[in-house]
């Protein structure tokens, strides 16, 4: 399978206001900005200006989307430099073109999975090899001389999600780093979503070739210590049954499940319609069940799951960064489409609360299972296995 490069495509563009105050003021430097990490922003500003951190104040603003891209000292750096030079408050705002050219984008990746079973259909061998680029140990976080050393150590972001939830006695996962000619960075779910797209597509195809129900087959092959993942998949299967799938041509339902960071469990179903006359793929309905431990705020958890389903549609069908020989071709939402309201499926969510288990982060968990669920639904609807993201109609003709 293959996942093309993606941009964070925040709806709000990056902007910052900086102001130096007179000596004796409580705060010598004030910065207004939308950032995912105001504490890191304060450290960066202190290192840059030589000021004590206590002399700097960050006023966090609404970001309009972050997804890993609002952790860098970029527009803030420009604003601080300019206000220091002219002695007046300065606002710096990127254009949409700047967003695509200067932001750190998710690298493309390519995956190959080979599976063997015994005579009963039980997994016996699992091999997963893939190539991509570092997203944490990258140019924006490390000096150039340290990058080769970091590549020897490995990058938690790019290996995230590469190990399967399925029990094969013989397993091997291989990764090769690629040095991309552009700046890379984290993107919602890091490399877990591309890896799970490969894993869940392979397991779904194996179940079909064996004549097994994909949900039952996945449950039967799960590692024994994963009852929470099994519960998510069973819950989402039951949720999907409440909405009968049309039996006419072009409709399909797919399932996928996965583990994020070893402690978050999720399963997703997707109902898809493929209209060959209009050459159109439509995701009509999705169900998502998620277990991240104690549900501190169930309503907010559901909102995160719904937003992950929106991004799943974009990742599966729309988002691809166009890169030319010497620059990035994508410049706005006309040539880098994201999901719009008319393309958003209806979504049912289920929060599986575990009061005795400490809560874990839920901002990007469901995204790992959404795209493979959509791809598996397309396989049911058309008989064609889509092997790259995003999936275009030409890929399934």
Tell me what each language-model feature is.
Residues 1-2:
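Short, well-ordered junction/capping motifs at the entry into regular secondary structure
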Residues 5-397:
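Cofactor-binding beta-sheet edge motifs in enzyme active sites
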């Amino acid at each position: 399978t293959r996942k093309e490069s993606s941009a964070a495509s925040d709806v709000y563009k990056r902007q910052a206001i900086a102001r130096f105050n007179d000596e004796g003021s409580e705060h010598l430097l004030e910065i207004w900005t939308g950032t995912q990490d105001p504490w890191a922003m304060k450290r960066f500003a202190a290192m840059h200006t030589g000021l004590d951190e206590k002399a700097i104040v960050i006023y966090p603003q609404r970001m309009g989307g972050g997804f890993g891209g609002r952790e860098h000292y970029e527009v803030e750096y420009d604003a601080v430099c300019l206000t220091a030079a002219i002695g007046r408050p300065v606002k710096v705002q990127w254009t949409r073109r700047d967003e695509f050219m200067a932001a750190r984008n998710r690298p493309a990746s390519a995956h190959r999975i080979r599976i063997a079973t015994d005579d009963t259909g039980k997994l016996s061998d699992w091999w997963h090899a893939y190539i991509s680029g570092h997203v944490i140990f990258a140019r924006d976080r490390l000096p150039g001389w340290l990058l080769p050393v970091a590549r020897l150590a490995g990058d938690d972001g790019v290996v995230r999600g590469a190990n399967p939830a399925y029990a094969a006695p013989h397993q091997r996962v291989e990764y090769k780093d690629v040095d991309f000619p552009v700046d890379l960075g984290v993107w919602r779910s890091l490399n877990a979503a591309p890896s799970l797209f490969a894993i869940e597509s392979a397991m779904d195809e194996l179940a079909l070739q064996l004549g097994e129900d994909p949900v039952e087959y996945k449950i039967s092959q799960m590692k024994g210590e994963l009852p929470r993942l099994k519960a998510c998949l069973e819950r989402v299967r039951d949720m999907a049954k409440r909405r009968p799938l049309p039996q006419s041509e072009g409709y399909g339902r797919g399932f996928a499940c996965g583990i994020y960071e070893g402690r978050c469990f999720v399963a997703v179903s997707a109902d898809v319609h493929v209209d060959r006359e209009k050459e159109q793929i439509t995701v009509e309905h999705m169900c998502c069940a998620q277990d991240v431990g104690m549900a501190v705020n169930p309503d907010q958890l559901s909102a995160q799951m719904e937003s992950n389903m929106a991004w799943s549609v974009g990742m599966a069908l729309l988002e691809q960064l166009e890169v030319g020989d010497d620059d990035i071709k994508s410049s706005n939402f006309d040539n880098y489409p994201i999901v719009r309201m008319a393309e958003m499926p209806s979504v049912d969510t289920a929060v599986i609360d575990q009061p005795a288990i400490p809560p874990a982060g839920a901002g990007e968990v469901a995204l790992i299972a959404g795209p493979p669920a959509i791809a598996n639904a397309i396989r049911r609807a058309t008989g064609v296995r889509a092997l790259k993201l995003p999936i275009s109609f030409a890929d399934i003709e």
